[in-house]
Amino acid sequence: MTKTYGVDVAVYQPIDLAAYHKAGASFAIVKLTEGVDYVNRRGPSRWTAPGLTTSTLMPTISRSFGSSVSRAKKEAAYFLKEAKKQDISKKRMLWLDWEAGSGNVVTGSKSSNTAAILDFMDAIKAAGWRPGLYSGASLMRTAIDTKQVVKKYGTCLWVASYPTMAAVSTADFGYFRQWTGSPSGSLPVTAWPGRRRERCSG
C-alpha cells in the first residue's frame, strides 16, 4: 500500500512549500475561493516547490451554499472562473470544502444537502476536472449521503477527523492510505498536532 503525506495550507502559512516537501509531503491543498466574493491571492498558481508538481497542488473552495442548489451553481461558476483564470492544471483535483462556519448552514436535510453538493461537483466534472469533497466525519455521517457521492465519483472523500487533540506524529496507514497534517503554523508535517483522515487519491 502506498503511504502518502500531504499538507492543507492555510492562507497565513508560508508560501514556500519546499519545507513541507522536505518533511515528507507529496501533495498540498490550497484554498482558491470562498463563496462568490473572495479569491485567495496567494492561491495555488503561486505555490511552487520541487517535488510538489502541478498535479499535486490542489485548490479548494470554501462554501456557503448549504443545501441550496441555485447557490451551489453560483459558487461553482465563481470557483471555476478563477480556476481557469489561474490556469489550474486539469491534472489537479478541485475540492469542495463543505462544513459548518463561514455562513454555511449545515442543518438542511441530508437529501437536500447532498443534492447541492453533487450539483457543485457535477459542475467541476463538466469543466474537465476531477472533484473531491472535504468535510468533517460527523457531517459525513449525519448530513451528507456519502454513499451517493462515492457511487457517482468513486474515491473522492477527504475526511476531517482527529483521534485526539494531543500531538500525533505517525499516521495509521492501515486505516487510510493518505494523511494530511492539521494547520499549526509552519511546523513540519510529521510534527503537526493531529491528522486528517484522507480517503482520496490525488
From Swiss-Prot:
<dbReference type="GO" id="GO:0042742">
    <property type="term" value="P:defense response to bacterium"/>
</dbReference>
<dbReference type="InterPro" id="IPR002053">
    <property type="entry name" value="Glyco_hydro_25"/>
</dbReference>
<dbReference type="InterPro" id="IPR018077">
    <property type="entry name" value="Glyco_hydro_fam25_subgr"/>
</dbReference>
<keyword id="KW-0326">Glycosidase</keyword>
<dbReference type="Pfam" id="PF01183">
    <property type="entry name" value="Glyco_hydro_25"/>
</dbReference>
<dbReference type="GO" id="GO:0016998">
    <property type="term" value="P:cell wall macromolecule catabolic process"/>
</dbReference>
<dbReference type="GO" id="GO:0016052">
    <property type="term" value="P:carbohydrate catabolic process"/>
</dbReference>
<keyword id="KW-0378">Hydrolase</keyword>
<comment type="similarity">
    <text>Belongs to the glycosyl hydrolase 25 family.</text>
</comment>
<comment type="function">
    <text>Helps to release the mature phage particles from the cell wall by breaking down the peptidoglycan.</text>
</comment>
<dbReference type="InterPro" id="IPR017853">
    <property type="entry name" value="Glycoside_hydrolase_SF"/>
</dbReference>
<dbReference type="GO" id="GO:0031640">
    <property type="term" value="P:killing of cells of another organism"/>
</dbReference>
<protein>
    <recommendedName>
        <fullName>Lysozyme</fullName>
        <ecNumber>3.2.1.17</ecNumber>
    </recommendedName>
</protein>
<feature type="active site">
    <location>
        <position position="8"/>
    </location>
</feature>
<dbReference type="GO" id="GO:0003796">
    <property type="term" value="F:lysozyme activity"/>
</dbReference>
<dbReference type="GO" id="GO:0009253">
    <property type="term" value="P:peptidoglycan catabolic process"/>
</dbReference>
<keyword id="KW-0081">Bacteriolytic enzyme</keyword>
<feature type="active site">
    <location>
        <position position="99"/>
    </location>
</feature>
<keyword id="KW-0929">Antimicrobial</keyword>
<dbReference type="InterPro" id="IPR008270">
    <property type="entry name" value="Glyco_hydro_25_AS"/>
</dbReference>
